Amino acid sequence: MKLNDLVQHISHTGASETDITAITYDSRKACAGSLFVCLVGAWLDGHTYAESAYQNGCRAFLVEHRVDLPADAVQIVTDDTRAALAVIGADFYGNPADELHLIGITGTKGKTTTALLTAAIMTEAGLPCAYIGSNGVDIAGVHEATANTTPESLELHRLFRKMLDAGVRHCVLEVSSQALRHHRVDGVPFEVVAFTNLSEDHIGPGEHPDFEDYKCAKRRLFAEYNARTMVYNVDDPYSDFMREGFKGEQISFGIQNAADYHGQSLAQYRSQTALGVDFDCVHAGETTHIEVMSPGTFSASDALCAVALCGAFGVTPAQAAATLAHTPVQGRFEVVEGLPGRTFIVDYSHNGLALTSALKTLRAYNPHRLLCVFGSVGGRTQVRRKELADASSAYADYTIITSDNPDNEPPEDVIRDIAGHMAPGAPYTCITDRREAIYAAVKMAEPGDIVLFAGKGHEDYQLINGKKLHFVEREIIKEACAEISK
């Protein structure tokens, strides 16, 4: 594709008939024939890597300001390279999103569970549906890992093209506030969008400066994308704010308040391999009994959202119920079998609201003791660390504070911050190495105990000093159980 053709739909200066065979924003992947896009992020500026891309053979650059490169380097200057990438990425892959039925889900909690359940229901109902989100990418049974909940726009359009090539015509995406803020989904023609809930999170360096900015970023999905249908949580106090200005069809779901999809008669259940919740879904005057393989009101709410989303494509609650009864979500209230009489739970609850909800839900099972193992991500605000400490102090019988993804912050500093917020008298210990913390919790567990390992969930790594190190919590729990059983 000629460079001039590639940039024809963006505002720019500069021109060239150079042939472009690839687009990248990673200088390590730049080569002859590629266009290197200099993205400006919270911590890194792609312009500083332009010379590295040049050394790798790249001669075409999309920049926000000219950089010092040899004369044979073509520089196309535009106001915002992230916004431009969304346009040229779509054009480069032939605008595949235009041929797809796209579902976008946003909210503080529940995006992953709702999206995965939606994809499973749609697929079993005869509408093969891909998934993009925190748990990676699934297209026709083929899995890919992702660096972000919502990939960069270039990756999205590559994935959309891959879906079409695989014969998949539906896709559900988790849409993060960062994706909305940084143009990752600009121009994506969402057909149906959903709002799960909103609470104070993702505020701090590199994220949102305050709650107002976070809240408004979320609302962009409903105010700016012209979807035909919006599904929203009528129980959430911010649902009216999210609905402002949406001109399409609106479908509500809820448990506490009357809704188009209303959940009632909730009851927890416990089996050998799962903790769950069942409830009745009332829709259009008909009642459908639904079982979900994760417990709590939040799980029921996420399932209702998925049922409503699928309903927007003609799938009935009865069809949805048949899928939900046998569909677990990895890393969300995932039961790890190990020692007799003990229940080990892996869950992604990584902020105060999620951890409070998880612990209160597990309390309803009347355990002998409820133990909680958690840490907090490095580089985030004190608010999250305090809220996590408050939750575990209030609802756990014993807490082990450990590392999560400390990244470039010393894990001991993060742990010290959390410990400083634990309530007076709340029993806890600090173990920096998360593997050691897991072993300690497994050894400590007695018959009748429930142990919650919070924060990692589906993740298969720990982020330490900028490096992703292999770390799968469920595997380590099983290792610890096997060692203790010897």
Sequence positions of predicted segments:
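ATP-dependent carboxylate-amine ligase
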Residues: 1-12, 30-35, 305-318, 322-331, ...
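Residue-level signal for inorganic ion chemistry
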Residues: 6, 34, 53, 88, ...
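Short, hydrophobic beta-strand segments that form beta-sheet elements in well-ordered domains
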Residues: 22-25, 57-64, 173, 229-233, ...
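Receiver (REC) domain switch/active-site residues of two-component response regulators
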Residues: 59, 191, 397
